[in-house]
A protein has these predicted regions:
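Motif-centric detector for short Cys/His coordination patterns
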Residues: 1-90, 123
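Extended, alpha-helix-rich binding/interface surfaces that flank or overlap catalytic cores
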Residues: 73-113, 117-128, 134-209
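Ampipathic, surface-exposed secondary-structure segments
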Residues: 2-28, 132-159
Length: 209
């Protein structure tokens, strides 16, 4: 198993900063970690890096952890989205790595907000194709199967004469297709999608050993 190498962990009044061995700094707010917020400097210094990328403070309780892969994924998404903004959000002008990260971020953001149809309606076929390819590349098999099935359901209406824009998709689906996408598969995505940040961080960052 490849793991992050953590050099140090530092605290300010409001934040915890994780410095990786390659010099990269990951930050999180202490408001997300109330037990760390209340802990003394000595207690905060007694951390352990677990094999799965979690930083643990076992003396403060089993649930007092910091997921470095999740923080790393946040940082990778911000970097890729900043690159996309500089290019006018034209994904074809990005390097493949950044393109995939942006597509996955959009899938996460819209998928957890309004579901697959919001993602597909906002970003279209090309983004969906890139996201599916990226899910396969990072090994997010459970999430890939769900999103691939949702995309497959839309295939029936791709040549429908009343399909003028992505906004028409939902109304052209049969009731059972709507139910499968929204009532069955979206909730499955909300559970399975938890695998994306950690697998994506592992795949896209070279700071693992």
């Amino acid at each position: 198993m490849r793991n992050l190498s953590v050099g140090s962990i530092d605290f300010t009044k409001a934040h915890v900063s994780v410095t990786l061995a390659d010099g990269r700094i990951l930050r999180d707010t202490l408001s997300r970690n109330p037990d760390l917020l209340k802990a003394s400097a000595t207690q905060r210094s007694e951390w352990t890096l677990l094999d799965d990328g979690l930083v643990s403070w076992p003396h403060l309780g089993d649930k007092v952890t910091l997921d470095t892969r999740w923080l790393l994924w946040e940082a990778l998404c911000k970097q890729a989205n900043d690159e996309a903004m500089a290019k006018g959000f034209k994904l074809d002008e990005l390097q493949p790595r950044s393109r995939e990260i942006v597509a996955l971020w959009r899938l996460e953001a819209d998928g957890y907000n309004g579901g697959f149809m919001q993602f597909f309606g906002n970003w279209g076929e090309e983004n969906c194709r890139i996201a599916l390819s990226a899910l396969q590349a990072i090994g997010a098999d459970a999430t890939y199967a769900i999103v691939a099935r949702q995309r497959e359901i839309l295939e029936r209406i791709k040549d429908h004469p009343d399909l003028k824009s992505y906004e028409d998709l939902w109304s052209l689906l049969a009731k059972e297709e709507q139910d499968e996408i929204g009532d069955k598969l979206d909730p499955e995505f909300w559970k399975a999608g938890d695998e994306i940040p950690r697998l994506a961080a592992l795949h896209y960052c070279e700071c693992f050993t």
